[in-house]
Amino acid sequence: MVMACAQQGDILWLDKEEQYVLVLSREFFNHSGMSVVCPLRDNAKPDALHIEISSDEYSGTALLEHLRSLDLQARHYRKISSIMYEQIQDITDAVQGIFDYYPYSI
């Protein structure tokens, strides 16, 4: 069975890992078969890299320091829900902050 391509903001359940993840990468990248995701937890304390999310079916915290890329075509997963645009915007801004270049002098 061919599964639809995951979309940015999708909350997925990974069967083998038995965990929820949030898809952070955009569709043009996800069509490669790979997707950048972060794990979701029910009981993590919110901070700069732990951002709370909610949808009709799930609420928890995205752990942005644990980004990873997954081959979703090779995994069994279920789409649980999607988060709102404003939430994905806050999350991608925080992730970008991890990689921003700030020159400094020694």
Task: Show where each model-derived region lies.
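Conserved functional hotspots at enzyme active or ligand-binding sites that engage polyanionic ligands
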Residues: 1-106
